[in-house]
């Protein structure tokens, strides 16, 4: 069949026929990204020159080993698909890589530049293909890349691998300054809580509620490096990463401790600005409270000098301590210790005056009863009975009647009442009664 085709074109040699077929095939099936047109022409000329030097070519002979020379075939037969050219239907490198990890919304699609290239924590696929999330927009972590060449796993399989708490999680903003790290880590902890990872966050005692898994540690490591670039990390964070670049849990634990310290600092400042003292508590306790607050603030970098501390203390004084505001307000070099010496002096004076007073306060009802008993005991009625009297059969009524009749009868004894009021009155009656004037 081949000899018949060649006999129809006697003026064309076998080599040139092969070259023409090859040129046609390369032109129609060439990959536009492979080689340029000038290179193809050079390859065609070299192939034509090599084939023209051959005298005879049998029909069943093998094709010369030329990577750009295809075997002579009819034009209708397509070229082989397993040739050396990269075909357009082949998968790209990004498509051949795994579509991502099977947890927490495919973290492989998150962009980051690792601090250290570790095979264990290196992301799958080239980093240049990862989409960049803007810091102001909460782009879901499971959002596929907008590039047309990337094809990831369908959403149904991704949903089954994600946690059931929230399908879309707003990522934290990008860290742009070391001074913003305390505020940024708060948003990052919130991001972990929304990603169903609240159990691995260290508590107040520095220990998490549950043990972190390897996949969760990988996710923690990758997301931390994505949104917190190394050039914007504080020095103490870099020191931790220099020892172990995967110890993100230690960074979170230290951050929580610093948050608590910041809260304590705020509470100390509020307490110092709202001090109140009127002597109701011991001066020693008040001094200890104030000095401890000032020492804590100074140790945490918030320096309170003597002038500011004295102003805050004197502003809260009241009662007898209030005059300290005016006696020493012009002394610029007054220290906190000197101010507390004055406070102690006033407190001790108050305690001394209180100790000099009687401790027991008399009840008004008791004072009334005591006054009655006092008159009865100091000025009692003097009644001297006659010891020789044997008959006491008269009633009290009769005796009282005799006393009244004897008082009404005029006698020399009654005149003695007007003469002297200090001497006892002696009534000459049978009862022999002696009464003082004050008892009437």
Curated annotation (Swiss-Prot):
Ranges of Basic and acidic residues composition bias in the record: 429-440
Compartments, as annotated in UniProt: Cytoplasm
Comp. bias (Polar residues): 1-10, 48-60, 127-152, 419-428
Site description Cleavage, residues in chain: 401-402
Renumbered residue ranges of the record's region RNA-binding: 299-401
Family matches, as Pfam families: TYA
Region (Disordered): 1-93, 126-173, 352-440
Signal keyword on record: no
Low complexity bias: start-end ranges: 153-165, 402-418
Domain of life: Eukaryota
Predominant cellular place of this UniProt entry's protein: cytoplasm
Modified residues (Phosphoserine): 416
Record-level GO cellular component terms: cytoplasm
One annotated GO biological process: viral translational frameshifting
Annotated keywords: Cytoplasm, Phosphoprotein, RNA-binding, Transposable element
Oligomer and partners: Homotrimer.
Domain notes for this protein: The C-terminal RNA-binding region of CA is sufficient for all its nucleocapsid-like chaperone activities.
Other known facts: Retrotransposons are mobile genetic entities that are able to replicate via an RNA intermediate and a reverse transcription step. In contrast to retroviruses, retrotransposons are non-infectious, lack an envelope and remain intracellular. Ty1 retrotransposons belong to the copia elements (pseudoviridae).
Role according to the record: Capsid protein (CA) is the structural component of the virus-like particle (VLP), forming the shell that encapsulates the retrotransposons dimeric RNA genome. The particles are assembled from trimer-clustered units and there are holes in the capsid shells that allow for the diffusion of macromolecules. CA also has nucleocapsid-like chaperone activity, promoting primer tRNA(i)-Met annealing to the multipartite primer-binding site (PBS), dimerization of Ty1 RNA and initiation of reverse transcription.
Protein name: Transposon Ty1-DR5 Gag polyprotein
Species name: Saccharomyces cerevisiae (strain ATCC 204508 / S288c)
Gene behind this protein: TY1A-DR5
